[in-house]
Amino acid sequence: MTLNLCVLTPNRIVWDSEVKEIILSTNSGQIGVLPNHAPIATAVDIGILRIRLNDQWLTMALMGGFARIGNNEITILVNDAEKGSDIDPQEAQQALEIAEANLRKAEGKRQTIEANLALRRARTRVEAINAIS
């Protein structure tokens, strides 16, 4: 038995295919979803989506949004998403270093909050790459 997974951003469909299982980062922690999962709607945190296709696991960096799960269908609507295999490792590492530097020199609450969010996004992209290597 499989699940139909659809990952959408405002600009494109990132994934629309059948999967065996997913592990999703939510605002209250990670959840695993298998066929016949109880229906839920949940907020999606900045984090990694792990997708199992038979014996292979793929990763995707998700940048926050929400998910609806029910009737063996999963719809994830996020601000942005990238497959781990599509992320340039050098660019992601450089973005992480820039985000860390920006956090160190942030002044005031607003800059600190924005720098922390940028750092979380950059770390998630690097984690998505490292999870597949």
UniProtKB/Swiss-Prot annotation:
Membrane topology label: Peripheral membrane protein
- What InterPro entries has UniProt attached to this entry? ATP_synth_F1_dsu/esu, ATP_synth_F1_dsu/esu_N, ATP_synth_F1_esu_C, ATPsynth_dsu/esu_N
Q: Which Gene3D superfamilies match?
A: 6.10.140.480, F0F1 ATP synthase delta/epsilon subunit, N-terminal
Gene Ontology biological process terms in this record: proton motive force-driven ATP synthesis
Entry keywords, A to Z: ATP synthesis, CF(1), Chloroplast, Hydrogen ion transport, Ion transport, Membrane, Plastid, Thylakoid, Transport
Q: Where in the cell is it found?
A: Plastid, Chloroplast thylakoid membrane
Please tell me where this protein is predominantly located: plastid
- Tell me the GO molecular function terms: ATP binding; proton-transporting ATP synthase activity, rotational mechanism
**Record-linked Pfam families:** ATP-synt_DE, ATP-synt_DE_N
CC annotations in GO: chloroplast thylakoid membrane; proton-transporting ATP synthase complex
Relate the assembly described in the record.
F-type ATPases have 2 components, CF(1) - the catalytic core - and CF(0) - the membrane proton channel. CF(1) has five subunits: alpha(3), beta(3), gamma(1), delta(1), epsilon(1). CF(0) has three main subunits: a, b and c.
Please explain the role this protein plays, according to its UniProt record: Produces ATP from ADP in the presence of a proton gradient across the membrane.
Protein family membership: Belongs to the ATPase epsilon chain family.
Please identify the protein, giving its name as recorded: ATP synthase epsilon chain, chloroplastic
Query: Which species is the source of this protein?
Result: Gossypium hirsutum (Upland cotton)
Q: What is the lineage of its organism?
A: Eukaryota, Viridiplantae, Streptophyta, Embryophyta, Tracheophyta
